[in-house]
Amino acid sequence: MSLVTEFKEFALKGNVMDLAVGVIIGGAFSTIVNSVVKDLIMPVVGVATGGLDFSNKFILLGHIPPNFKGNPDSYKDLQTAGVAAFGYGSFITVAINFVILALIIFMMVKFINKLRAPAPAEAAAPPPTPEDVLLLREIRDSLKNSPRV
């Protein structure tokens, strides 16, 4: 088999194509989750915490250069200028994105597994009572009904 033929078989197998589709959809889905966190959840968290904007929360690690023309309270401006800063607010936002994404994926997998699960089988009829048990029951019943001596 030639290298081209082997690669063609590999690339056109169902699993590789499924993976490619999953990566593309995952990229689009990530954008949606980022928007949900940035535009819907973080503003609510900001209001709940008294108007805090987590994206601009940082600890300055270096010195701001004298020719710095940006906003010294803007993490993005400081990053652009090459100032060392520990951006914990950005990390909090990314961590929330991850938790929400993981929760949504978990719920989707759970839903898909529920759809794939086979329908519960009907309860099987109980097995017939063995003959020796039936015979013992007959003996018991006849002893109950017989007069005592």
Curated annotation (Swiss-Prot):
Membrane topology according to the record: Multi-pass membrane protein
Q: What family does the Swiss-Prot or TrEMBL record give for this protein?
A: Belongs to the MscL family.
User: One MF term in GO for this entry?
Assistant: mechanosensitive monoatomic ion channel activity
Kindly give the Pfam families that the UniProt entry links to this protein.
MscL
Keyword annotations: Cell inner membrane, Cell membrane, Ion channel, Ion transport, Membrane, Transmembrane, Transmembrane helix, Transport
Species source reads Paraburkholderia phymatum (strain DSM 17167 / CIP 108236 / LMG 21445 / STM815) (Burkholderia phymatum)
Self-association or partners: how does it assemble? Homopentamer.
According to UniProt, the name of this protein is Large-conductance mechanosensitive channel
Compartment(s) of residence: Cell inner membrane
List the InterPro entries hit by this protein, alphabetically. Mechanosensitive_channel_CS, MS_channel, MSC/AndL, MscL_channel
The residue ranges crossing the membrane are 16-36, 40-60, 89-109
> Which coarse location class applies to the principal site listed for this UniProt protein?
membrane
Question: Which purpose does this protein serve, as stated in its record?
Answer: Channel that opens in response to stretch forces in the membrane lipid bilayer. May participate in the regulation of osmotic pressure changes within the cell.
Q: Choose one Gene Ontology CC annotation of this protein and give it.
A: plasma membrane
* Superkingdom assignment: Bacteria
